[in-house]
């Protein structure tokens, strides 16, 4: 796995730490020195850069997220689809994943599930 911690992307995004690893990408916490904010940068793994199917999926993911607008969905701020590096810059949300929550608290109860449901 490529590690971008300590590197700067496009002279703007200072990669600070890994926050998640998936099958085709790695998500990093980064500092955006242009907009002065913390962001999440999702980078397509190098091994998939030459696979047209994975590149297409990655691009489609960024388009789908960018089209959605809801308080519970992160915003897409920027994308880069270069030949050697492809990434999506998104709103960073600090906290734990549902998987981590379940590991710490056990199975989620009905009361907890109702707490997390949208309140319309």
Language-model features: locations:
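Activation-segment/catalytic-loop signature of the eukaryotic protein kinase fold
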Residues: 79
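Flexible N-lobe loop architecture of eukaryotic-like protein kinase catalytic domains
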Residues: 20, 60, 69-72, 85, ...
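Protein kinase glycine-rich loop
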Residues: 15-22, 27
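A short, low-complexity linker immediately N-terminal to eukaryotic Hanks-type protein kinase catalytic domains
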Residues: 1-15
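Conserved N-lobe loop of protein kinases adjacent to the ATP-binding glycine-rich P-loop
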Residues: 31-38
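Conserved short submotifs of the Hanks-type protein kinase catalytic core
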Residues: 83-97, 101
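Activation segment signature within eukaryotic-like protein kinase domains
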Residues: 116-117
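AlphaC helix of the eukaryotic protein kinase fold
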Residues: 45-67
């Amino acid at each position: 796995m490529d590690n971008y911690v300590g590197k700067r992307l496009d002279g703007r995004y200072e990669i600070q730490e890994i926050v998640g690893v998936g099958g085709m990408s790695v998500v990093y916490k980064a500092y955006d020195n242009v907009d002065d904010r913390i962001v999440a940068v999702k980078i397509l793994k190098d091994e998939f850069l030459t696979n047209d199917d994975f590149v297409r999926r990655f691009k489609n993911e960024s388009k789908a997220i960018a089209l959605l607008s809801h308080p519970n969905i992160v915003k897409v701020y920027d994308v880069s689809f270069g030949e050697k590096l492809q990434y999506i810059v998104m709103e960073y949300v600090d906290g734990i994943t549902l998987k981590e929550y379940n590991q710490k608290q056990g199975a989620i109860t009905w009361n907890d599930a109702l707490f997390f449901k949208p309140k319309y």
